[in-house]
Amino acid sequence: AGTLETFRGQVIKRHTSNMESLMLESFQKLLRKTELVKALSIDSSTFEATLTGRDGKNLPFDRLSAGERQLLATSMLWGLARASGRPIPTIIDTPLGRLDSEHRSHLIERYFPNASHQVLLLSTDEEISNDYLEALRPAITRSYLLDHDETKGSTSIKEGYFA
């Protein structure tokens, strides 16, 4: 391999190593089972992610609950955003759907206020309860309600979703 190819490989390994640590740190902040995952590795040629469990063995993604897989995906996006070093707006649709109450609290307290300089949450009316709203309120600049009118077949935007 030539000098340029060697340099390219070194840069990719350095960046994947940084992403591994940021993604793992993000995942561990969101999980309620703090000892579930010991390591997260990314293959620098295929970019395939692998989890290592507390026992030191490979932890297949299908051994994670649906909520844990959702948190893993969120952690990967959070880690990538943090690794980029750029302010990237984050849009999250129905963010709390599959999660138990403890994982919901972790997202509300640890992720949403820190995910980006600008976070758009597209939530259902059931997802953000009064307790969650109070925890998020310091980070909310504006809120809107998407109001669908069946007869007109259109949706209007109204200010004050949490009013």
Predicted features by range, described:
Residues S26, A66-I92:
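GG-anchored amphipathic helix commonly corresponding to the ABC/SMC/Rad50 NBD signature/C-loop
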Residues L64, L80-G85, Y111-A115, R137:
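Conserved catalytic network of the ASCE P-loop NTPase/AAA+ motor domain
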Residues R86-P87, L99-L107:
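Conserved D-loop/post-Walker B switch-helix segment of ABC ATPase nucleotide-binding domains
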Residues I12-E20, A49-M76, P95-S101:
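Conserved ABC ATPase signature
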Residues A1-R32:
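Charged, surface-exposed helical/loop "interaction arms" that form contiguous linear patches used
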Residues S105-A163:
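C-terminal lobe/lid and adjacent interdomain/linker elements of RecA-like ASCE P-loop ATPase modules
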